Regions:
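Alpha-helical interface subdomain recognition
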Residues: 1-136
Length: 136
């Protein structure tokens, strides 16, 4: 989850820099309202994943009984948000993000391969629900 949060933060930073340096109609594209809204949504996704991952790590460090539950929550939240952030950031970049010269595709690929390297979000979500059910 921490790796995914780091990837989201890096992708967000690259995207904001691009929005502030790419000019269209004589002004940075980051000034356009629709792009501002998308960038704000990216930040919400990054920060929500970061918060869940931080809480899960703190719970694990303290040895609390909820650590397994929060680990599953952090795992699928960060995986889902990482895929969403990278896909939306690529859309904000436009065509340049699809080229090998730009690093955006590397973050997107990392977000996608997380599904195969670790468990899928659906599997993690199922484990989370089973753990929640067991606690009831």
């Amino acid at each position: 989850a921490g790796e995914q949060v780091g990837g989201m933060r890096a992708m967000f930073k690259i995207t904001i820099q691009y929005l502030n340096t790419r000019f269209q109609f004589g002004e940075p594209i980051g000034r356009f309202q629709a792009l501002k809204h998308m960038a704000a949504d990216l930040l919400v996704d990054v920060e929500s994943a970061s918060t869940v991952a931080r809480i899960a790590a703190q719970t694990m460090a303290s040895g609390s009984g909820d650590s397994e539950l929060l680990t599953y929550l952090a795992a699928f939240t960060c995986a889902d948000n990482f895929r969403k952030v990278t896909a939306d950031a690529i859309q904000l970049h436009g065509g340049i993000a699809y080229t090998m010269e730009h690093p955006a595709h590397l973050y997107w690929r990392r977000a996608q391969t997380g599904q195969w390297l670790y468990a899928s979000s659906d599997k993690l979500r199922d484990l989370y629900l089973l753990e929640m059910e067991a606690k009831l």
